[in-house]
Amino acid sequence: MEWSQIFHDITTKHDFKAMHDFLEKEYSTAIVYPDRENIYQAFDLTPFENIKVVILGQDPYHGPNQAHGLAFSVQPNAKFPPSLRNMYKELADDIGCVRQTPHLQDWAREGVLLLNTVLTVRQGEANSHRDIGWETFTDEIIKAVSDYKEHVVFILWGKPAQQKIKLIDTSKHCIIKSVHPSPLSAYRGFFGSKPYSKANAYLESVGKLPINWCESEA
């Protein structure tokens, strides 16, 4: 199974013309993130056959030079967003990795699908592209991963992500969940949750190579 087949199946099942028309207008008349060519970067960097872990985000960062198509990741020269800083703090506490760069392309290449449930956003307006159709598309992506893969780790931070559990066959996949790494909630159970070592322990238990969460040149 490849993304091209899954995309074909989804777009055959659902009509995304209204969303397509909306996005054409938005990209023509407003500043929208990420750049058009990066909307699907999560799928470009993580082929379907390589998926070991799915980390669900919400919508892209809405500031300049941030979003580039991977959930939680920002472009190499951007400032660290607070949630990502907390993710790295937990990573250091969990398995001793100290990451210096704010982009997560190496995770994506390791097999971590960094999937936002909404893939575009208008500059400075969080959730501005909610309910235009992306949720339908990404729900189908989650279901496809659940249906066609085995032994994938789904990392679900915060209530919106955890609402997606209903799309996942928990009998053949691993669910790791906690509060969101946002500064508003991280101290209520994200810190100390050890998602990275738990994910690797599960992967190794089913005969898969663990994720290299530490800094990579990739």
From Swiss-Prot:
SUPFAM superfamilies: Uracil-DNA glycosylase-like. It is found in: Cytoplasm. PROSITE patterns: U_DNA_GLYCOSYLASE. The active site is at D59. The keyword DNA damage applies. GO terms for molecular function: uracil DNA N-glycosylase activity. It comes from the Bacteria. GO terms for cellular component: cytoplasm. Its EC number is 3.2.2.27. It is an enzyme of class 3 (hydrolase). Pfam families: UDG. GO terms for biological process: base-excision repair, AP site formation via deaminated base removal. The keyword Nucleotide-binding does not apply. It catalyses: Hydrolyzes single-stranded DNA or mismatched double-stranded DNA and polynucleotides, releasing free uracil. Keywords: Cytoplasm, DNA damage, DNA repair, Hydrolase. Belongs to the uracil-DNA glycosylase (UDG) superfamily. UNG family. PANTHER family: URACIL-DNA GLYCOSYLASE (PTHR11264:SF0). Excises uracil residues from the DNA which can arise as a result of misincorporation of dUMP residues by DNA polymerase or due to deamination of cytosine. This is Uracil-DNA glycosylase. It comes from Staphylococcus aureus (strain MSSA476). The gene is ung.
